[in-house]
């Protein structure tokens, strides 16, 4: 078996194709990749987004991200299939150093509720407020002393 490298392919589909056609295209390229000897690690539809510049008279596109592993020969074949397709308006494959880490779900509400339940964070914030108040009072005191010294 040859050396298996990690790759990420991002391709943009035309914005005017139907949702079921989008899933058909995703399935089609996933199957082609596996047929040509690649292993799919992750496939995500990123949704319709505005393009930075107009491509093939389109201002928007449907982004699809595909993480895969293989010997590198499968990339030429999958890119050829994308080049021939009229529904793919842009594609790019990048070689990765290793497998991409799985994204952790970031819930702002869960971290906020943890902070509310944790009494240490409340104490720290009260201490910070008292330090801020004491700093401003010292500054006023120093300002008054300077004014008195300049007046004398």
Curated annotation (Swiss-Prot):
Region (Disordered): 94-152
Protein name: Small ribosomal subunit protein bS6
Pfam families according to UniProt: Ribosomal_S6 (PF01250)
Gene Ontology terms describing biological process: translation
Species per Swiss-Prot/TrEMBL record: Prochlorococcus marinus (strain MIT 9312)
InterPro entries: Ribosomal_bS6, Ribosomal_bS6_CS, Ribosomal_bS6_sf, Ribosomal_S6_plastid/chlpt, Transl_elong_EF1B/ribsomal_bS6
Gene3D superfamilies: 3.30.70.60
CDD domains per the UniProt record, alphabetical: bS6_chloro_cyano (cd15487)
Gene of this entry: rpsF
Biological function: Binds together with bS18 to 16S ribosomal RNA.
Keyword vocabulary terms for this entry: Ribonucleoprotein, Ribosomal protein, RNA-binding, rRNA-binding
Basic and acidic residues: bias regions: 114-129, 138-152
Keyword Endoplasmic reticulum appears in the UniProt entry: no
GO CC annotations on file: cytoplasm; ribonucleoprotein complex; ribosome
Family (UniProt): Belongs to the bacterial ribosomal protein bS6 family.
GO molecular function terms listed in the Swiss-Prot or TrEMBL record: small ribosomal subunit rRNA binding; structural constituent of ribosome
Superkingdom of origin: Bacteria
Signal peptide: none
């Amino acid at each position: 078996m040859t050396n298996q490298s990690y790759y990420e392919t991002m391709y943009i589909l035309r914005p005017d194709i139907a949702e079921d056609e989008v899933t058909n295209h995703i399935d089609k390229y996933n199957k082609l990749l596996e047929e040509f000897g690649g292993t799919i690690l992750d496939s995500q539809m990123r949704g319709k987004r505005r393009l930075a510049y107009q491509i093939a008279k389109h201002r928007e596109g449907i982004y699809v991200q595909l993480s895969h592993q293989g010997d590198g020969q499968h990339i030429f074949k999958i890119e050829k299939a994308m080049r021939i397709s009229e529904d793919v308006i842009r594609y790019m494959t990048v070689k990765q150093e290793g497998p991409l880490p799985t994204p952790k779900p970031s819930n702002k509400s869960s971290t906020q509720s943890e902070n509310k339940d944790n009494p240490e964070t409340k104490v720290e914030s009260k201490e910070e407020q008292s330090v801020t108040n004491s700093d401003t009072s010292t500054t006023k005191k120093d300002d008054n002393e300077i004014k008195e010294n300049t007046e004398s």
